UniProtKB/Swiss-Prot annotation:
Its EC number is 7.3.2.1. GO terms for biological process: phosphate ion transmembrane transport. GO terms for cellular component: plasma membrane. It catalyses: phosphate(out) + ATP + H2O = ADP + 2 phosphate(in) + H(+). It is found in: Cell inner membrane. This is Phosphate import ATP-binding protein PstB. Pfam families: ABC_tran. Transmembrane segments: none annotated. It is an enzyme of class 7 (translocase). It is a peripheral membrane protein. ATP binds at G48, P49, S50, G51, C52, G53, K54, S55.
Length: 262
C-alpha cells in the first residue's frame, strides 16, 4: 500500500476528519485506508484518473451508499465530533447538513419555486412570505435569481443545462447545509456555464465547506484551495492546491498533473 503525503498546515481547522476509511463494493476493495482532514470553509478538489475512487470517497460523506446493502464503509468519518459511519442520526438530517450536486443536472419535475421549497418544507415550517424570501435567497446565492424571477412557477426543465445545474445548487443550499459536495458538476456544461459555476463555487466557500470531484485539472487549479490526488483507491497526495500543481511531493502526482500519467 502506498504511503500518503499530506501537506496541510496544523492551523487549518478541519470540518470532516477521515480516519482509516475503507470502502467495498461487495468483495471489491474500492477505498484503501484513507486518512485526511477536509478543511472548513475551503474548496477541496479530488482529482485522479477514472475509477480511482474520487466519487466513491465523496459519496461516503453523506452515506449515499446506504441504499445498496452490498456496499459498506469501515473506519471513521468524523464531523462535529460524531462518526457518521456509526451514527444513528437520521439519514435525511445528515443529507440536509451535507448537500450534494451530481454530474448531470437533476431538477425535480416541478416548478422552479417548488424545486427550491421542496427540501425546505421537509425540515422547516415557514410562512409563505418566509418561503418566498428563502427561494429568492437561494436563487440569488446560485446567481440564478435575475434569470428565473419572472418564471418561478414554470417547470425547471425549461431552463438551460447550466441554469438547471445552478438550480440544483440553489436547491442544495436552500436548506442551509454545512457541507456541499459537487460530483463533476460542470462535465455536461458548455464553457460559459462552467465559468459561472466556478464563480459560484468561489463565492460559496465563504459560508460552506465545498468538496468537488473533477477530471479537469485547470478547474481544480482555478477553484480549489486544497487538492487530493487519488489512484487505485488510495490517497497519494493531499495539500494546498498551489503546491500540488507547482511542486508536488510525489512523482505519481506530478506525472498525472503534467499529462505523463499512464
Amino acid at each position: 500500500m502506498t504511503s500518503t503525503v499530506i501537506d496541510i498546515p496544523d492551523s487549518v481547522r478541519a470540518k470532516i476528519d477521515v480516519r482509516n476509511l475503507n470502502f467495498y463494493y461487495g468483495q471489491f476493495h474500492a477505498l484503501k485506508n484513507i486518512n485526511m482532514s477536509i478543511p472548513d470553509r475551503k474548496v477541496t478538489a479530488f482529482i485522479g484518473p477514472s475509477g480511482c475512487g474520487k466519487s466513491t470517497l465523496l459519496r461516503t460523506f453523506n452515506k449515499m451508499y446506504g441504499l445498496y446493502p452490498e456496499q459498506r464503509a469501515e473506519g471513521e468519518i468524523n464531523m462535529d465530533g460524531e462518526n457518521l459511519l456509526t451514527s444513528r442520526q437520521d439519514i435525511a438530517l445528515l443529507r440536509a447538513k451535507v448537500g450534494m450536486v451530481f454530474q448531470k443536472p437533476t431538477p425535480f419535475p416541478m416548478s422552479i419555486y417548488d424545486n427550491i421549497a421542496f427540501g425546505v418544507r421537509l425540515f422547516e415550517k415557514l410562512s409563505r412570505s418566509e418561503m418566498d424570501d428563502r427561494v429568492e435567497w437561494a436563487l440569488s446565492k446560485a446567481a440564478l435569481w435575475n434569470e428565473a424571477k419572472d418564471k418561478l412557477h414554470q417547470s425547471g426543465y425549461g431552463l438551460s443545462g447550466g441554469q438547471q445545474q445552478r438550480l440544483c445548487i440553489a436547491r442544495g443550499i436552500a436548506i442551509r447545509p454545512e457541507v456541499l459536495l459537487l460530483d463533476e458538476p460542470c462535465s455536461a456544461l458548455d464553457p460559459i456555464s462552467t465559468g459561472r459555476i466556478e464563480e459560484l463555487i468561489a463565492e460559496l466557500k465563504d459560508e460552506y465547506t465545498v468538496v468537488i470531484v473533477t477530471h479537469n485539472m485547470q478547474q481544480a487549479a482555478r477553484c480549489s484551495d486544497y487538492t487530493a490526488y487519488m489512484y487505485l483507491g488510495e490517497l497519494i497526495e493531499f495539500g494546498e492546491t498551489e503546491k500540488i500543481f507547482i511542486k508536488p511531493h510525489r512523482k505519481e502526482t506530478e506525472d498525472y498533473i503534467t499529462g505523463r500519467f499512464g
